[in-house]
Amino acid sequence: MIKVGIVGGTGYTGVELLRILATHPEAEVICITSRSEAGMPVADMYPNLRGHYELEFSEPDASVLASCDLVFFATPHGVAMRMVPELMASGVRVVDLSADFRLKDLDTWANWYGMPHESADWAEKAVYGLPEVARDAIRDAQLVANPGCYPTAVQLGFLPLLEQGLVNPARLIADAKSGASGAGRQGKIGMLHGEIGESFKAYGASGHRHLPEIRQGLTAAAGKGVGVTFVPHLIPMIRGIEATLYAELDNPQDFDRLQALYEARYKDEPFVDVMPFGSHPETRSVRGANHCRMALHRQEDSNIVIVSSVIDNLVKGAAGQAVQNMNIMFSLDETMGLNAPALLP
């Protein structure tokens, strides 16, 4: 049984980790930390977990965390980079759901997150945890940087095109929409139901923190620099991401083989579903599930490839992918604890 700790358990990704791990046959959560809610029973904050956990939130205790086999960080940026080195020295393995170890260029990280990085050595050693790309490296990693939600949907949608060099890498567009849970659980006026209900807007159009992460992943896939325009949008639903992706095909005759290319690329990936050409994936088809569903489109004789990619931002975009990474790290069935279908309606 894997002894698991969770640092930062009061946000949406924290409770999603608890929900998934509650029925995981090979993992036991032995501690969950929150400075603000120390002493509160987990089930008092999250009534859906009544009967599943007797744990109380506790202050972070290095000795308790050091007794874990694996620790998940579901914290704001800047926390994990300060705590991880001590855990690494104790031999604990870590999956960090924050952005602290995702970027390899630490000047870029500091520019986007407004503080200097305090753990350069571990930032270099961390494995970027997109299983569909880095499964072997994840298996041996001590520290895994769990990908962001938008970057997961965008990278999975673009990967086959860039890996095969079929599109112009300088002209990529990602038009993405997310539910409100992507903004976290803190009380913000702009996220009140009365503010976002019956409304729809772009945000971060001049630059978003996930842009350098997307660019880093797509550059690796293409083997050369990429130019990507990424614009996120907030839509009035709780969870889910839809990313509509556009790329310019170098040879329009390649359209005829794109469906087969995508199906071949993802045929052995348990959590990627390539739908029939021309389908329209719905966010509700992945709600609560660790899946990415995608479909290809073409408008008349255009040389523009359109890919629609959907995920649940809290599952494949956060906690589910983190548990998937844990499974890989401990040589378990990758799908363990993650087989539940999406919730409908």
Curated annotation (Swiss-Prot):
Subcellular location: Cytoplasm
Catalytic activity field: N-acetyl-L-glutamate 5-semialdehyde + phosphate + NADP(+) = N-acetyl-L-glutamyl 5-phosphate + NADPH + H(+)
CDD domains xrefs: AGPR_1_C, AGPR_1_N
Active-site annotation: C149
GO cellular component, one term: cytoplasm
SMART domains according to UniProt: Semialdhyde_dh (SM00859)
Pfam families in UniProt: Semialdhyde_dh (PF01118), Semialdhyde_dhC_1 (PF22698)
EC id: 1.2.1.38
Pathway: Amino-acid biosynthesis; L-arginine biosynthesis; N(2)-acetyl-L-ornithine from L-glutamate: step 3/4
Alphabetized GO MF terms: N-acetyl-gamma-glutamyl-phosphate reductase activity; NAD binding; NADP+ binding
UniProt keywords, alphabetically: Amino-acid biosynthesis, Arginine biosynthesis, Cytoplasm, NADP, Oxidoreductase
GO terms (BP aspect): L-arginine biosynthetic process
HAMAP family: ArgC_type1
Function: Catalyzes the NADPH-dependent reduction of N-acetyl-5-glutamyl phosphate to yield N-acetyl-L-glutamate 5-semialdehyde.
Family: Belongs to the NAGSA dehydrogenase family. Type 1 subfamily.
Protein name: N-acetyl-gamma-glutamyl-phosphate reductase
